[in-house]
Amino acid sequence: MPKAPDCSELSDSCSLAGGTGRFSGPLHRAWRMMNFRQRMGWIGVGLYLLASAAAFYYVFEINETYNRLALEHILQHPEEPREGTTWTHSLKARLLSLPFWLWTIIFLIPYLQMFLFLYSCTRADPKTVGYCIIPICLAVICNRHQAFVKASNQISRLQLIDT
């Protein structure tokens, strides 16, 4: 019977080649040390980055189309709004006149918030999940500030006894 190869190296391919069917490298050990929430957090981060790479490619492919439509909109000089113009057409015309950097900022803030939330799910301490979301972060900071003010007021009320 052939002896299985020594899998003490850092390679996971060695364990697959040995026929054991299980990973035994440091990645597998780190994965087994995580709880379910952390594993799902890392899977979510990976899928989110993959989807954002696809969206990033798509956005920069349509950036040229957006610029062309915006230029066409600026070059047209309608004297007065037409009677048959719907509110959706009017809204589309106004939104196309916004610069691309503004659209980038509008979409970047929720994107970063979602990424930071998924990344916070990978933390070992479940109490730290969600601290990076702006409303929660502001609430925590305000709560800490109020606790500090309350503590400093209590200290100032203490009377010093001269001996």
From Swiss-Prot:
Annotated knockout phenotype: LYSET knockout mice display increased lysosomal enzyme serum levels and storage materials in lysosomes. In addition, LYSET KO embryonic fibroblasts are resistant to infection by EBOV glycoprotein (VSV-EBOV).
Keyword Transmembrane carried by entry: yes
Biological-process GO terms, alphabetical: intracellular transport; lysosome organization; protein catabolic process; protein targeting to lysosome; regulation of protein stability; regulation of vesicle-mediated transport; response to virus
GO cellular component: Golgi apparatus; Golgi cisterna; Golgi membrane
Residue intervals passing through the bilayer: 40-60, 98-118
Keywords attached to this entry: Golgi apparatus, Membrane, Transmembrane, Transmembrane helix
Compartment list: Golgi apparatus membrane
InterPro entries membership: LYSET
Coiled-coil regions, chain positions: none
Bilayer topology term: Multi-pass membrane protein
Family per record: Belongs to the LYSET family.
Full protein name: Lysosomal enzyme trafficking factor
Upper lineage: Eukaryota, Metazoa, Chordata, Craniata, Vertebrata
